[in-house]
């Protein structure tokens, strides 16, 4: 194969904390250009770094984001098949709707701004609830967060209180690796010593 001269444009995503292209620093949110004569078998190595950070959300609360992924606190849940017939179509298990109810408390707030990222090899199913390819450990405080009146298992839009009752280290995982989850949480003020 004959060499060919052309420009290669590599888009560096803005959600990256840092990037290199063939060892050269590239700026997130910009295009990194390589103009040269290319030979058969040459490769371009793009390395992106990501930072776990709290991102403001509705009602003064926050989500945990790392790169393009949003992370959620998975909740233990129990599901019930909801079989019915509508417009002459019978919905019977397993091809029916399911009602999913939490089996643990959902009232948590972020209790710090340092996070520990755990990466694993991607398995046969990348959206696995049991073995997600990445998790982020975070300090969370248990808080009072009630259910909507008359709707057990459906949390109110905002917590009843931000007074912490217990601190726990919990693993959050990508939103797509959860069934029942808390994604938007309040953050307690962080005090530095």
Predicted regions located by residue number:
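Solvent-exposed beta-strand/loop surfaces of large extracellular or lumenal domains
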Residues: 16-37, 52-59
